[in-house]
Structures are given as C-alpha cells and as structure tokens.
Curated annotation (Swiss-Prot):
Name this protein carries in UniProt: Uncharacterized protein MG323
Location of the RCK N-terminal domain: 3-119
Pfam family, one: TrkA_C
GO molecular function: monoatomic cation transmembrane transporter activity
Origin species: Mycoplasma genitalium (strain ATCC 33530 / DSM 19775 / NCTC 10195 / G37)
PROSITE patterns: RCK_C (PS51202), RCK_N (PS51201)
Lineage: Bacteria, Bacillati, Mycoplasmatota, Mycoplasmoidales, Mycoplasmoidaceae
Entry's transmembrane regions: none
One GO process term, biological-process aspect: potassium ion transport
Record domain RCK C-terminal: where: 134-221
Amino acid sequence: MKRADFCIIGLGRFGMQVAQSLKENNFNLLLIDLDDKKTDTASQQFDYVICCDASNLTALEELQIDEFAGVIVGVTNIEASIMICANLRELGQKNIIAKAKNEVHKRVLSTMGIREALIPEKIVGKNLVIRLIHGLENEIINLGNEIIFIRSAVNNKAFFNKRLEEINFRQNTDANIISIMRSNKTVVFPLGPNTEIQPGDIITAVCQQKSLNKYLNYINPKTKNKN
C-alpha cells in the first residue's frame, strides 16, 4: 500500500465528509472503523479501508500510525474517543484532530495534548456565517484559530494562462494555494511555480480569516464583499 497522507478513524457522517474533501484534493487516505458495514460502504469509494478496533493499541501500532501526516478521529462515543486519542499519543502521533461531542469532551481532549478538538455543530454554524458574509458561491471552511480553507472559481481574466510565480498569491493576498481543479475536473497537485491558471479553474487555498476579503477581491475583483 502506498503511504497515506492522513488516517481517518470513525466513518460516521463527520469522518466520511472529511475523507471525501481530502480525496477531492488528491490526498492519500487510510480509513478505519470497527463497524464492518461502514467499512464495506467506504471501500466502494476509497482504496484503503480497514475494519479494526482503534482503541486496541496493538492494532494501531501495526499500522505505523506515527508515520501519517495527521490523524482525524471522528468517533462519537466519548470513552472510545479518549482511548483512541490516548493510543495515538502513546504511539507518537502528534498531529491529531478529534471530533468532540460536547465542551467537557473537548476540554478532556485538549488536556491530553490533542492538537485540535472540534464540535462539528459549532463549526457548521461558523462556516455558514462566513459564507453569508463572503458569498455562498464560495466553499469556505473555518479550520479554527482564524484559519480559513476556501475553494473558489477564478474570474480574474488577467490571471488566465499566467504562472503562479507571476501572480504570486502569497505576497499579494497572504494566501497559500493548495490545489487547482481544471474545468475537466482534473486536480493539479502538488503545484509548482510554473503551474498556470486557466479559464474555468477552481482554486483551493488556505488563508487567515482577516485576509479573506483581500484574497477574494484579488481572484474575483468584481465581487462585492461586505466588511
């Protein structure tokens, strides 16, 4: 098996949504769940899916979990979530993002040294507000700590057939471009300085929330954004 970039444990709605978004951006994934029905369903969409008990330290150790770029824990059961996160920490995985059921669960995970504990319902609310402010046509996700993940079409004709090195998004907008989806749905990743912007491109980027208006106005100068 090719080394996956991310491991997702727990294939409920949250875990599968994260997996689908990462897949669309050309990341390699390993998906894990204890429920064989969920893994059977997931295996129809993803290449690497394992049915195993992630609360079992030995099972995780065999997967060399510390070599993954990050692990997303989407388990709903609080006790199982805590056990899995404890195992991940013991095995040396530091980049852990975990779903929390409530504020108490979130605090427990934070005290364990989990990098990010998220309550999905609150995140959804924040994302909707940001989209209402900046335009519902943009796919915007608040990653926490004022960091925004955004996917948006490029309508600035001045950028068409120009190289990323010439446009210099980072210097002009404080945004980092992650990937580009062409009009034929082909995803360009990773990107290089000579990668060109073409008509119909949809760009995925990460930026600070305070720089979002600057970025959107740069790629779509006719867009009227509030604030």
